[in-house]
């Protein structure tokens, strides 16, 4: 069985964990503390496959092409969704451990292949039901809609995750805690999530007989569609058999148009993550009667008074084939700037995830604040908001301070001076832009 020191995955394991090809022998652990943080270690593999998808998309004349604004927003949502786990253990795992410690009535052996495979099936079925309820209950949809807000379908879309989703998903895995040790669950909850990364692509078409058993890119494309035939279909994580068993399966047929039935039209990360909650609150107060108010929360997002629990499929906007994703024009120079700043941020973020156990509490707090400020500021730049210049100026000043005091270090020591020079020039530029915007605003007011 896997040993305590095996907290870092090998390159082979790194790729295999993305396709649920790890064996029980190499991924069984006696305690939760021994379980590798597979998701945190997956970042380089995510980036590698995303770059491969981009290259293959360029080589194909009709291949999918990445939009920088959508790409950065998806990665930003994924980064934000992982930040709470810097401060605390995941809610899913914490709840599971509590139930295990207080209520389990049977302790299956952690080093048994039978336990491993039972956990594989149990977690996957639990995910199916959580995912289904996340589409059928408006209060859960408020979190899950983040993942569906992209109007594109590529590997970066897989990383567009919700901050709040974990606060409800634990419920659907709790029965497993009555007999399956937490260390086994901690492995499979990560593997289930990682598998779902590679199926977010248009490059893989049909996988033959595997389509009967596994959730594949074709099946999951349907799930992300806003075509009427795609709504509330294909909830599977790894095994598509659950959808076939419970009547929610639909094969890919007409060209899929991706995204929400009512697109959000923004790339600002706080709006992407949380804008549905104020909308839900507004709907709650607009409808009359306590029954209708409760229905706003506990029925589907398409429900209105007098309609079925999940809404009327006839109310779904029809697909014309002329739908265009939200993609406002912005200069190539600004795109290059945002890309460069984002990848500087990504290096800090990845180091924060991997080194959090050896960093001081103050360092973790400062770097987390820096990541949040950066995600916000870059979102403002992409959205071309009026106060983006001032926020970016403040962010650049913070970067210089963190770098000067050793909280941020470049990937290579030789890059220290170029990085400082770039940030200094950026600070000056955004300061001048801020002054110009304030001056122009004052002139208009006068």
Swiss-Prot record:
Location(s) in or outside the cell: Endoplasmic reticulum membrane
Q: Which EC number(s) are documented for this chain?
A: 1.14.16.5
Looking at the UniProt entry, the stretches that span the membrane are: 39-59, 103-123, 167-187, 329-349, 362-382, 410-430
Query: Which Pfam families does the UniProt entry name for this protein?
Result: AGMP_C, FA_hydroxylase
One GO BP: membrane lipid metabolic process
| One cellular component term from this protein's GO annotations in UniProt | endoplasmic reticulum membrane
Q: Which domain of life is it from?
A: Eukaryota
Q: According to its UniProt record, which cofactors does this protein need? A: Fe cation
Main location (coarse class) = endoplasmic reticulum
Tell me the keywords, alphabetical order.
Endoplasmic reticulum, Iron, Lipid metabolism, Membrane, Oxidoreductase, Transmembrane, Transmembrane helix
Residue ranges annotated as motif Histidine box-1: 131-135
Mode of membrane association: Multi-pass membrane protein
Q: Where is this motif: Histidine box-3?
A: 220-224
Q: Which family does it belong to?
A: Belongs to the sterol desaturase family. TMEM195 subfamily.
Matching PANTHER family: ALKYLGLYCEROL MONOOXYGENASE (PTHR21624:SF1), STEROL DESATURASE-RELATED PROTEIN (PTHR21624)
Per its record, how is this protein called by name? Answer: Alkylglycerol monooxygenase
Organism in which the protein naturally occurs: Danio rerio
